[in-house]
């Protein structure tokens, strides 16, 4: 990826997320509800719920919205029963895609995903066709200029799997999904605030898209992320400005 700045890509991605703040609340409500349903309503014993609640607080979601979502998940309040579904497929030039949905209508979800992929030059694949190209892990990114030694010491002591310093000076901390929240809290307690922190599907290899192909791929990703049932989209594609 010669000439490609990972830091620039992260900033671009954060900008896109901020522009879709309205949908972020909807996604987080769904995630909190499903997390509570699957693992219980106590954040101390449910790492997935703990991470979702922490993200909701960072996005300034009102506390009563968070509490209601947890209660819907535990059954204390009536709510929609969302099902988790993962679709795999391909985008422009065969770029791998993983599309995670939370939906109350599986038929609608798959029809919408298939339609967007077909419309934008991609196609839906079979289960497992691209998942092997990604690693399920926690990722925390620190901006260039952050002390590598401080991050390394705090992260590894808290149980992180790896600390990677990129050519542009940004630092990535990789964790097991179950250790993500503990590592994030340990780093923040040490005064180290990540600019991006998420449990994600991290591609083993990335392909840089630029020019017309980059524009097409970005349109495809945006269209998928705009679907109501879609929670997350992971790809091997990196869009270069």
From Swiss-Prot:
One GO biological process this protein is involved in is: regulation of DNA-templated transcription
Q: Got a GO cellular component term for this one?
A: cytosol
Quote one Gene Ontology molecular function term.
DNA binding
Indicate the transmembrane segments per the record. none
Q: What is its main location?
A: cytoplasm
Which Pfam family is one of this chain's hits? TACO1_YebC_N
Q: Which UniProt keywords apply?
A: Cytoplasm, DNA-binding, Transcription, Transcription regulation
Gene3D superfamilies named among the record's database cross-references? 1.10.10.200, 3.30.70.980
Q: Report the locations given in the UniProt record.
A: Cytoplasm
Superkingdom: Bacteria
NCBIfam families membership: PRK00110.1 (NF001030), PRK12378.1 (NF009044), YebC/PmpR family DNA-binding transcriptional regulator (TIGR01033)
Q: Which family does it belong to?
A: Belongs to the TACO1 family.
Q: How is this protein named in the record?
A: Probable transcriptional regulatory protein Mfla_2355
């Amino acid at each position: 990826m010669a000439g490609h700045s990972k830091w620039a890509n992260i900033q671009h991605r954060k900008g896109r997320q901020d522009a879709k703040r309205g949908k972020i609340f909807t996604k987080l409500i769904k995630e909190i509800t499903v997390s509570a349903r699957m693992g219980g309503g106590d954040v101390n014993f449910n790492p997935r719920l703990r991470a979702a609640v922490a993200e909701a607080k960072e996005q300034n979601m009102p506390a009563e919205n968070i509490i209601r979502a947890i209660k819907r998940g535990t059954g204390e309040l009536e709510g929609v029963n969302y099902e988790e579904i993962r679709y795999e497929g391909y985008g422009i030039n065969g770029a791998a895609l993983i599309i995670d949905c939370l939906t109350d209508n599986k038929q609608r979800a798959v029809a919408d995903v298939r339609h967007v992929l077909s419309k934008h030059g991609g196609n839906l694949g079979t289960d497992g066709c691209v998942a092997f190209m990604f690693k399920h892990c926690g990722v925390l990114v620190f901006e260039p200029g952050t002390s590598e030694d401080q991050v390394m010491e705090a992260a590894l002591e808290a149980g992180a799997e790896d600390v990677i310093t990129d050519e542009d000076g940004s630092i990535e901390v990789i964790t097991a999904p179950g250790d993500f929240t503990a590592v994030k809290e340990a780093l923040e307690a040490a005064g180290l605030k990540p600019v991006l922190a998420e449990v994600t599907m991290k591609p083993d290899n990335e392909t840089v898209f630029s020019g017309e192909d980059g524009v097409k791929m970005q349109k495809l990703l945006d269209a998928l992320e705009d679907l109501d049932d879609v929670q997350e989209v992971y790809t091997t594609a990196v869009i270069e400005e």
